[in-house]
Amino acid sequence: MTDYYYPVLSDETSLPLYVLGIGARDREFHFVREDGYPNHQIIYCTRGQGHIIFDGHEYDIKPGDAFYLPPSVPHEYYPVGDIWETHWITFEGREAIEMLKHIKLEKAKVFHINDINAVDAIFKKILYLMKCVPTFPPKQDTSSTVSKKK
């Protein structure tokens, strides 16, 4: 499944935590980000294998493994083999740092998710809910303004 969503934000940026993007890829791309990414990222593997490099360390990423990258941390990641399916979320907010401290993600880190099914269910709910958020500007109903030709 390759699916993603980047909401158009307005007042949401005043919230303590907000999603900037969320998605899933059948085959993750090869990314080299010398200046890092501008927002917090959490990426986890659902199938296949990948490799990530940050802070001078290299890690193999397998199903159930995840990594957190704070903003502006230089990194590189890429698939190993033909399949590397990932799910990812990017976020910000004035309480993002406190939330991350609470779950012990204070710096770039690779970790294993013990209950991948529970995390995947939450991920799918967030993706669904993000798609329900109206876009800005809202689409206008033009059905009542159609003119008839004589």
Which residues fall in each region the model found?
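Residues at the C-termini of beta-strands that transition into short coil/loop
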Residues: 23, 90-92, 114
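DNA-contacting interfaces and partner/effector-binding or oligomerization modules
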Residues: 62, 97-98
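Generic protein-terminus/edge-of-domain signal
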Residues: 1-60, 65, 81, 103-110
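Short glycine/serine/threonine-enriched helix-capping/active-site loop
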Residues: 20, 86-91, 140-142
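Amphipathic alpha-helical segments enriched in hydrophobic/aromatic residues interleaved with Lys/Arg
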Residues: 99-150
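Ligand-binding loop in jelly-roll beta-barrel domains
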Residues: 71-95
